[in-house]
Amino acid sequence: MSDFWVHLLVYLVILFGFVIVSVLLFIWLERRFIGRFQLRPGPNRAGPFGLLQPIADAIKVLIKEDIIPTESDKGVFWLAPLVAFVPVMLMFAAIPFADGAMLVDLNIGILYILAVSSVTVIGIFMAGWSSNSKYSLLGAMRTIAQEVSYEIPLVLSILGVVMLTGSLSMNEIVKAQSVPFVLLQPLGFFVYLSAAMAEINRTPFDLLEAESEIIAGFHTEYSGMKFGLFYLMEYAEVLAISAIATTLFLGGWQGPLLHPVIWFITKVLIIFMFIIWVRATIPRLRIDQVMAFGWKFLLPLSLANLVITAFEILAAPDMNTAVLIGINIAVMFGLILLFSRFYKLGGGRVSVK
């Protein structure tokens, strides 16, 4: 029994260290690449290539004064960062970095991840409500609206993968991918990545902390370590959705020659680079556009993906893989083009009475 607890403690320390180091690396990579996209060098003073800049920023946040608003609900205000941060860390318990390299191999792993990830929004709402600030509360309400709008297409996109594998275990889903599911489920991958970016409030869906509208949104009144926890939470969520996308659609740790962990990290970095590219390319949407995109565009596409997956399983179980991949990619582009004709993003002036 003692050996079990020792192994558990060691794995938890390694996992926590991996997440923290990855978050610091992600922050540095994002700032460097955003700088390149904007024709500037990015951070390049603190250490070689600016590698020490995230560490310097972390130290700065830790020594900042911890300010608590006078009229805030102090207990809830203090607890909110923990309620938001801890569930994100718990998500990594069921993500396999290699065959069996996970804290616990749950037979309902993906269901566990979806359930735990939903708790984060409670922490965000606690922060917005307890701050006694209209900007914080507005940011929190936007979070609730986005969570409701994008959780459904997110779950439906994952359901397509579950239908192909017949398992909810993350480890079994990876082993079932003799061909990466991004080729067999291209539409599901598109819906998952779009909905996941909206759920973690990345550009162009970053309305809950839109600086030009509501200052910093739900964490406007936070400073010091509490603000640092929210900042860590945001980038840990990016790492989590990249790891989940890698597991469900990119074959997880599988790949030739290199060590499985190296393959896993490489695929996670590819997803993260794509998220950075989207941030540097697409402007922030309005709140009505974000809601419409989820309900009028992603939800029908996710339902269509389920119907297509069910048809392929029942009617064409022995179809040549290359032909199936070609059909799926063609259907994906066709459906996106079709629904984009019906769905209008909106724009121009909006009259306010």
Swiss-Prot record:
It is found in: Cell membrane. The lineage of its organism: Bacteria, Bacillati, Chloroflexota, Dehalococcoidia, Dehalococcoidales. GO terms for cellular component: plasma membrane. Its EC number is 7.1.1.-. NDH-1 is composed of 14 different subunits. Subunits NuoA, H, J, K, L, M, N constitute the membrane sector of the complex. NDH-1 shuttles electrons from NADH, via FMN and iron-sulfur (Fe-S) centers, to quinones in the respiratory chain. The immediate electron acceptor for the enzyme in this species is believed to be ubiquinone. Couples the redox reaction to proton translocation (for every two electrons transferred, four hydrogen ions are translocated across the cytoplasmic membrane), and thus conserves the redox energy in a proton gradient. This subunit may bind ubiquinone. Keywords: Cell membrane, Membrane, NAD, Quinone, Translocase, Transmembrane, Transmembrane helix, Ubiquinone. It catalyses: a quinone + NADH + 5 H(+)(in) = a quinol + NAD(+) + 4 H(+)(out). It is a multi-pass membrane protein. One of its GO terms (biological process) is aerobic respiration. This is NADH-quinone oxidoreductase subunit H. The chain crosses the membrane at residues 8-28, 75-95, 108-128, 148-168, 178-198, 229-249, 258-278, 297-317, 319-339. NCBIfam families: PRK06076.1-2. It is an enzyme of class 7 (translocase). Coiled coil: none annotated. Belongs to the complex I subunit 1 family. GO terms for molecular function: NADH dehydrogenase activity; oxidoreductase activity, acting on NAD(P)H, quinone or similar compound as acceptor; quinone binding.
